[in-house]
Regions:
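Short, charged N-terminal beta->alpha structural module
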Residues: 247-269
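Conserved beta-strand hairpin/beta-sheet module of binuclear metal-dependent hydrolase folds
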Residues: 2-62, 151-154, 158-162, 255
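FMN-binding flavodoxin-like domain, especially the glycine-rich phosphate-binding loop
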Residues: 172-212, 216-219, 261-277, 287-385
């Protein structure tokens, strides 16, 4: 697949993986992207996952069409992109590996027996590499989302090779809208590092970018402003749109009843969007992504071992470790003798910024009663304002 006249896609699709990074469900698989740039000198951009060594090397050879690669440019050392560096070096003993200081240090840890003597080109932030008419400029992007990450700008074809930036879940041979799986990918994997993404976006804003080539997901070629705007929203932790996420855990169905009753009341009152998640059964990463997508969140759980139910604890931890902020939160707690869930949940957000707590909350003692229905009505009224 040609990206431009001189840039050819050499990546692979993975339909073997069921959990990316051992935790994110990927029903449509994953893409591990790699690119070949043809010029007076040739460059390969990154490698792919270890399970696809032969397929990737064949793709690279096909793209090179009989030529030898001059450079392997390593932007990111996470194994889904770096696993085949040693295989490449063995296959092409005359090629030079291009990376930064931190990348080479990591490379030594991943491949302790690999000998790169005389085959290393160490680059600094802002330095360029000329292939011929193509000039590649390296922009360091530390903690987006590893410390060694850099992106590469081709000023000739105006292409940004964005490392994991602008990536998404899903293989390239499965068509699906970009936003949802890119949001889930960003919030889950990169979301903790919003300030670092903001810095990279500022640099990107100074470049004339016509295509974005990520290491995951499709090449972005049209309406780039849409994708950049989404990244700006996600990395600044602002709500994308108005709506309410109701996230609950329930043992015997009573807390579930309260959560579902609230959702029904919200819909009756014309709330623009209402999404309900059973945290024990639904995809946790989707629940987290939607909590960042919408402006308001309701947490409904029971007191459990003098704390809160484990799935709710996990959910809140995932939010707070990703700098959840700028949201309104309401609480529904349940308990049979000494409810503490609301206090515990609220305390977990002590370090979160710009959290507005609803005035109306719901306290259930074992089962939903008439007074709880009134509390739920009041909470729905407040959330729909």
């Amino acid at each position: 697949m040609k990206i431009t006249e001189d840039i050819i896609y050499a990546g692979v699709n993975d339909h073997q993986v069921d959990l990316f990074e051992g935790q994110y469900r990927v029903p449509n698989g994953m893409a591990y992207n790699s690119y070949v740039i043809l010029d007076e000198k040739t460059a390969v951009m990154d490698t792919v996952d270890a399970n696809f060594a032969d397929e990737w090397l064949a793709n690279v050879a096909k793209a090179l069409d009989g030529r030898k690669p001059d450079y392997l440019i390593v932007q990111h050392m996470e194994p889904d992109h770096s696993a085949n560096i040693e295989n490449f070096v063995k296959a092409y003993p005359e090629a030079t590996v291009v990376a930064n200081t931190k990348t080479f240090a990591m490379m030594k840890n991943f491949f302790p027996k690999m000998d790169l003597a005389g085959r290393k080109l160490e680059v600094k932030d802002g330095e360029s590499l000329t292939l011929g008419k193509h000039v590649l400029t390296f922009v360091f992007a530390p903690m987006v989302h590893w410390p060694e990450v850099m992106v590469t700008y081709d000023s000739t074809d105006k292409v940004l090779f964005a490392a994991d930036g602008f990536g998404k879940f899903g293989a390239l041979d499965r068509e699906e809208p970009w936003d949802d799986e890119a949001r889930r990918y960003f919030i889950g994997i990169v979301g903790k590092y919003g300030p670092q993404v903001q810095k990279l976006l500022k640099v990107a804003g100074t470049l004339d970018i016509q295509k974005i080539c990520s290491l995951h997901g499709p090449v972005l070629t049209e309406n780039l402003g849409h994708y950049i705007e989404k990244y700006d929203i996600w990395s600044s932790y602002r709500p994308e749109e108005e709506g309410v996420v109701v996230a609950y855990t329930s043992v015997y169905g009573n807390t579930k009843k309260a959560a579902e009753l609230l959702a029904d009341k919200l819909k009756e009152k014309g709330c623009p969007k209402v999404v309900v998640y059973d945290l024990a059964r639904d995809d946790m990463s989707a629940a987290v992504a939607d909590a960042f997508r919408y402006s308001k969140l309701v947490l409904a759980t029971l007191t459990y071992n003098a704390g809160i139910y484990p799935f709710m604890q996990d959910f809140i931890n995932r939010l707070t470790e990703r700098s959840f902020q700028n949201r309104t939160i309401g609480l529904i707690e349940n308990g049979s003798w000494a409810p503490t869930a609301a206090k515990v949940m609220k305390g977990m957000f002590d370090k979160s910024k710009n959290i507005t707590w609803t005035e109306n909350n719901v306290k259930v003692m074992s089962a939903v009663k008439e007074e709880n229905v009134k509390e739920i009505e009041a909470l729905a009224e407040e959330l729909c304002k």
